[in-house]
Swiss-Prot record:
Protein keywords: Antibiotic, Antimicrobial, Cytolysis, Formylation, Hemolysis, Secreted, Toxin, Virulence
Modified residues (N-formylmethionine): M1
InterPro entries for this protein: PSMbeta (IPR008846)
Name the record gives this protein: Antibacterial protein 2
GO (cellular component) term, any one: extracellular region
Any one GO molecular function term: toxin activity
Protein family (similarity comment): Belongs to the staphylococcal hemolytic protein family.
Gene Ontology terms: biological process: defense response to bacterium; killing of cells of another organism
Amino acid sequence: MEKIANAVKSAIEAGQNQDWTKLGTSILDIVSNGVTELSKIFGF
């Protein structure tokens, strides 16, 4: 869950700084880490 929180923080900071490339990669990190956490929960 820490990775998701860090990715959200990075996305917020990138949005505030109008760093669109970092914002895009942060959003992908959120999705990727979310899928990883769900996989752990459901045992995939």
